[in-house]
Amino acid sequence: MRFTIIIPTCNNEATIRQLLISIESKEHYRILCIDGGSTDQTIPMIERLQRELKHISLIQLQNASIATCINKGLMDIKMTDPHDSDAFMVIKPTSIVLPGKLDRLTAAFKNNDNIDMVIGQRAYNYHGEWKLKSADEFIKDNRIVTLTEQPDLLSMMSFDGKLFSAKFAELQCDETLANTYNHAILVKAMQKATDIHLVSQMIVGDNDIDTHATSNDEDFNRYITEIMKIRQRVMEMLLLPEQRLLYSDMVDRILFNNSLKYYMNEHPAVTHTTIQLVKDYIMSMQHSDYVSQNMFDIINTVEFIGENWDREIYELWRQTLIQVGINRPTYKKFLIQLKGRKFAHRTKSMLKR
């Protein structure tokens, strides 16, 4: 078996060496490092490792996004001799392959001609110990499934821990998206796959530090707009209600609400721009399936973290909620009730300690 590992890099000097030396397999493999324009020591590090280790190739691009780098790697697979790659992986430069685990994927892939994808578990670094990511807990044993049979796969919108048939190199990441560029390509691959082999082993560990894409107003606006765009696109791709609910749950709860919490903790003063953006998101949810609890969690995030409400901004918020069937009192009554709710919440939190 022959397979290719694509690693998109850009200023990853802190982690790239650890990843490259962690890759080992009994199969014939090659590593394509596609750099998007690093200005640190990433490229010199890769070049030094090329002299120490076999299989590493480096392609340098300028001002290229992660999606562009991955697409370059996929194009390379398509353009080379078909016998050079039976399969491929894409691994983040902040990840590491856990010892002896890569061949768990390759063994499963070789075991059955109908296997088009092999998916293992992902881990995160918790105080020096690898812990299973909660989104991967549904992989409890080794088994063969399809997306229809296992819609939980839609909670795993990451390349890490996945081995793809080389025929999926024809697919492309969305270069117009900075953060969710891989959602559509992953869904298409899952839908096209004849069979998907699940491996109940932690394959890849993630050393990434969560820097958040929502640290300032401009980034937050761009990020939320992107989430709305990809959410609508993928929801239109999914035919079964259960699939749409699982995907929307992941996007609404993890991507949107978690980012909203982070942003509002950094910028608690409620502004017209923030409320308008949340309104746009809530209204976009109405055009597709969603978990109702996620709607209430988003509302709680805005009301519990938000500060410095004024009458005009509150009225915009109140009318938004009325449009989706949720009543809110007048401005003064809202402030009184909110103060009471926050006090009760703090008291409950103190009693739990």
UniProtKB/Swiss-Prot annotation:
Signal peptide span: none
Top EC class, one word: transferase
Annotated EC: 2.4.-.-
UniProt entry keywords in alphabetical sequence: Cell shape, Cell wall biogenesis/degradation, Glycosyltransferase, Teichoic acid biosynthesis, Transferase
An example Gene Ontology molecular-function term: glycosyltransferase activity
One of the GO BP terms on file: cell wall organization
Entry similarity comment: Belongs to the glycosyltransferase 2 family.
Record's protein name: Putative glycosyltransferase TagX
Organism: Staphylococcus aureus (strain NCTC 8325 / PS 47)
Species lineage: Bacteria, Bacillati, Bacillota, Bacilli, Bacillales
